[in-house]
């Protein structure tokens, strides 16, 4: 790793910010994840600037900047749709609430500012005039060794801000680093501070973690250090719980493998994490098969996933998606008729099908370190069958029927009410079995038969 930083890596907007501050007589440094990522050869997602200019000076220097964190000395400069945080140098302060400093103390020394940061690899700065890397805590060595180490005394850092322990777990996954033993050992003693972190922040860290190639690295840290016992103890019920002969892993390790193999967005990966959460509460030994069974673990798991998602403040849409996928992650393939496939589509919802394909493939591949490709054949056949049924364009909801409630009331003389919806549901069932019946005359004839048989009026 070179001693000098290649300043050409920083975008023109960052150089413009630095030039404006220099023009007004202020010093500035490139800091944060942008420096860290550039030094390890990864294109930075964002760039931050630290400066000895005070907040009022920043507003004068950048009158169009958003005062996103002015209390803490931060403004956000927007250039060509991209956001750049510019922050006044700050020193250390007490953290009584376990999340925020009691008072903000602005300083002029970049080393003092870096000393308050969480990990050595994030406590690096670059002088934009020379490209010199300022590294008072050995962050460059830790980057080379791929080690995540707290700045200074780990227990002090974690006692200041409870979110830092969760960030440690995330960085282990997203950076693919190993956690320094002393840093890891400091997590459990500071869990009382971690308990002060809001559920929303925990959720956000989970979703950021899910962008890693192997998010299981983070969740293993959370398990080993006690964080998961605080945020989601239900998942821990699967640790060490053996499964049936088709699984090489216990419930916990299978969940980790499924999550890693689930090549979807972060919310889908949360569903993968929780898909078998109901197994420990449904496990029974079968005298007939001489093996473990987990009957209804999908339903039990969905009932467990709902309060977990509520507790972590997932949005309504995210919660519904996760719970639906846990509830419907089990399905069968061969031997299904077209009618059975249509019922399955109605049950799971057309908008969940692609998610279920991704989740099911990850579920199968997560049964062992290596899975025979023949094990994927049932899923491929199911996908082909569903594609054929969808291509046929047959009715899959009441809206697809050739008659509606108004037609039934007009042609059969029925009053409005819940009975109309029930009758439409009956017609959909008939059409599910025989799609050719989905035409007005046939449906009205069937409706008359149902009304006559049940005495509806």
Predicted regions and their residues:
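Catalytic cores of the polymerase beta-like nucleotidyltransferase superfamily
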Residues: 1-457
């Amino acid at each position: 790793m070179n001693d000098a930083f290649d300043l050409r890596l920083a975008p023109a907007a960052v150089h413009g910010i630095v030039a404006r501050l220099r023009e007004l007589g202020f010093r500035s440094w490139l800091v944060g994840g942008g420096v860290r990522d550039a030094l390890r050869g990864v294109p930075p997602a964002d760039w931050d600037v630290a400066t000895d200019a005070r907040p009022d000076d920043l507003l004068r220097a950048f009158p169009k900047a958003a005062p996103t964190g002015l209390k803490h000395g931060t403004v956000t400069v927007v250039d060509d749709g991209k956001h750049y945080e510019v922050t006044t140098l700050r020193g250390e302060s007490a953290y009584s609430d376990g999340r925020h400093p009691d008072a903000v103390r602005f300083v002029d020394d970049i080393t003092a500012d870096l000393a308050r940061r969480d990990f050595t690899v994030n406590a690096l700065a670059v002088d934009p005039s020379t490209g010199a890397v300022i590294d008072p805590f050995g962050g460059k060595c830790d980057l080379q060794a791929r080690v995540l180490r707290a700045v200074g005394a780990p227990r002090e850092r974690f006692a200041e801000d409870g979110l830092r322990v969760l960030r440690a777990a995330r960085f282990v996954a997203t950076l693919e680093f190993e956690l320094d033993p002393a840093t890891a050992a400091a997590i459990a003693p500071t869990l009382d501070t971690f308990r002060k972190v809001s559920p929303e922040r925990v959720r956000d860290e989970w979703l950021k973690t899910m962008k890693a190639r192997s998010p299981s690295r983070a969740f293993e840290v959370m398990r080993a250090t006690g964080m998961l016992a605080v945020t989601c103890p239900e998942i821990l019920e699967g640790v060490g719980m053996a499964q049936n002969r088709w699984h090489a892993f216990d419930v916990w390790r299978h969940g980790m493998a499924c999550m890693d193999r689930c090549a979807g967005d972060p919310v889908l990966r949360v569903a993968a994490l929780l898909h078998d959460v109901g197994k420990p509460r449904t496990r029974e030994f079968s005298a007939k098969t001489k093996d473990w069974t987990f009957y209804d673990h999908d339903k039990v798991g969905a009932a467990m996933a709902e309060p977990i998602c509520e507790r972590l403040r997932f949005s309504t849409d995210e919660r519904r998606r996760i719970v639906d996928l846990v509830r419907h992650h089990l399905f069968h393939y061969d031997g299904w008729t077209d009618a059975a496939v249509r019922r399955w589509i109605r049950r799971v919802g057309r908008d969940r099908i692609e998610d279920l394909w991704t989740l099911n493939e990850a579920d199968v591949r997560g049964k062992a370190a290596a899975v025979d490709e023949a094990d994927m054949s049932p899923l491929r056949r199911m996908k082909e069958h569903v594609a054929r049924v969808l291509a046929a364009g047959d009715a899959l909801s009441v809206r697809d029927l050739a008659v509606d409630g108004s037609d039934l009331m007009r042609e059969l003389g029925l009053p409005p009410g819940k009975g109309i919806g029930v009758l439409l549901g009956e017609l959909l069932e008939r059409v599910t079995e025989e799609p050719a019946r989905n035409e007005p005359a046939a449906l009205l004839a069937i409706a008359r038969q149902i009304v006559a048989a049940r005495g509806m009026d």
